[in-house]
Amino acid sequence: LSLGGHMHTMFAGARKFKLFYRLSFKRMVIRFEDNGSAALDFVCSKDELYKILSDDDSIEIPESQIPILPSNMRYFSKNEIEEFHKKDESVTKPIVILLHGLSGSSSEAYVRCISKILFERYGFDCAVLNSRGCGLTQLTTPKLFCALWTHDLRHIADSIKNAYPNRPIYAMGFSLGGDILANYIGQEAENCELTAAAIVGSPWDLCGSS
């Protein structure tokens, strides 16, 4: 039974489908040049989520962010952050950056569904970019995001490519996240760091879709 796009949107917003596509995440909070903050949630195994840290390591709770996350998520540790940013040309495992829709986050069912398949079935690393103010990310500036705001995605893609120059980077954007991704690709043109991208359910005429 089809009740139209508005009803579909309301139903998907009301139902989070928490019993399906269960995943664990490690969160890295990114601080940009303008002091804005966004969060990258990396899909991880349960063993990785609950692993015992060494004596010289500790969980890094970023300044201005909430100290307690949902039970299926934790912050990166100090050593994990250092390791992630360390340049390593030997890493060739593909990574997918996922961009959620308006007011979404890594907790959305559509994000968890595709992330679970890519991570568990195909062996991709998956990182969900929670936009400023989304997914329990605390705002550190008055600036939010919109379909034309590609700065944060560009920063993430460039950072990954600089650390892992031989690693294929893919991206998938849903709804508003797809618009951000499409604009980023258009702006970067031949300089785009992405190997491939997919845009799902995005409005092409934002004014007409309002």
Which positions does each model-derived feature cover?
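Core residues of folded domains in eukaryotic genome-function proteins
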Residues: 26, 34-38, 92-95, 122-127, ...
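Alpha/beta-hydrolase-fold enzymes
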Residues: 162-210
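Alpha/beta-hydrolase active-site loop
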Residues: 142-164, 183
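Short, surface-exposed "cap/lid" segments of acyl-processing enzymes
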Residues: 45-139, 159-162
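N-terminal targeting or regulatory segments adjacent to alpha/beta-hydrolase or S9 domains
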Residues: 1-37, 44-57
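Alpha-helix capping and helix-loop boundary segments enriched in small/acidic/polar residues
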Residues: 102-105, 140-151, 171
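Structured beta-strand/turn binding interfaces of compact recognition modules in eukaryotic regulators
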Residues: 33, 41-45, 99-102, 129-132, ...
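Structural signal for hydrophobic/aromatic residues that build the beta-strand cores
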Residues: 40, 96-99, 114, 126-129, ...
